[in-house]
């Protein structure tokens, strides 16, 4: 709307007034999403990621844990994510000259890697992924051990819930800055983590005071989380986008259950001479005060006085319950990064094409997390700590961190078509055999050794020709029989 200045300019220079009006309209319509007319004001607008975490991180964490513990489809979604993302393990294979020695040592150490003696190293990584998904983050503490402890490598890993980190610790100490329990030097390099001596929620003493936190060197801690915003020092639960919607769905289900309970109760409205319907003396008070005439016995015959009108109350059914629940579960699955079928186990509306499209999209997201987050920030750190400890213990001559990682193999959606496509890529030079093996979770070197061993055995047994004929769908020729001679 033109103001006084616009009118004044338009009076003496209409062209200039028109240009001002057009410019104002363009500015007003540039971003409708920034309009202030609807009163939408995001919470803590302009706050940093660390400020948001300091305010809401703990609440999101406890709510996410509650959903994981109590809501079946949330549990199914988280477990499906971990099963597909980690599976039976993300396996390293050394590329050093003494790779066989390193790999054998790692396999032996992995069985004893857990400081709590619960998991092997792959199980510990899976537990870390589960905790990082629900809580948003977790800690893995590197625990050096003595040679006398008898471990293959004197190192163990202790998986800690993020509650061990003193999130309330912020400020400055000795020229360093502490942000949500993480201490940085003046150059912004991570120096230490402020950890409690025990889990703050552990009930070990009824009279314990507030636990004190102490700094632990950063090179002894692996902080596993997936930052979303630049400068984000702490992780946020991956359930955060769906917490409110899951809660709304739970309330809706409770309301529907209550409505169904009311529908199953047969209600009757009586009109006319209702006083004669209640003959029992114990119900006289109820009749006078509330008009309650008692209950209807199942299968019984009730005598109704003349002049009494009875009307059965029939609550109207509310349609759309199933449709809304399915719609909400689709949104929840999308927010969790899994498919609807993984979340619910409902396969009734799935066909081959839709299942393939959903799985491909899910796998892209899982692979991105594997290669851009889990492997560089968790698996590599564990591998490097293992190599360092082995060198210090004299188990290896030198540090050589080079390795290949094998992620969990994906099951085929259509085995015949998928294998043909892979073979076409290999023959066309678009991929290598090793790459295809790694994408399926196999270790190329081990596969090649097994193939060589198999062919050597076939050759030594004289059955190689038969095997090759079977590969070309040709039946092997029967061995000639010796002629028989007649006996007199």
Regions of interest found by a model, annotated:
Residues 2-18, 346, 356, 373, ...:
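C-terminal anchoring/interaction modules
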Residues 96-103, 300-416:
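Surface-exposed loop-to-helix/strand elements on domain peripheries
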Residues 102, 106, 325, 329, ...:
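Short amphipathic alpha-helical coiled-coil/interface segments
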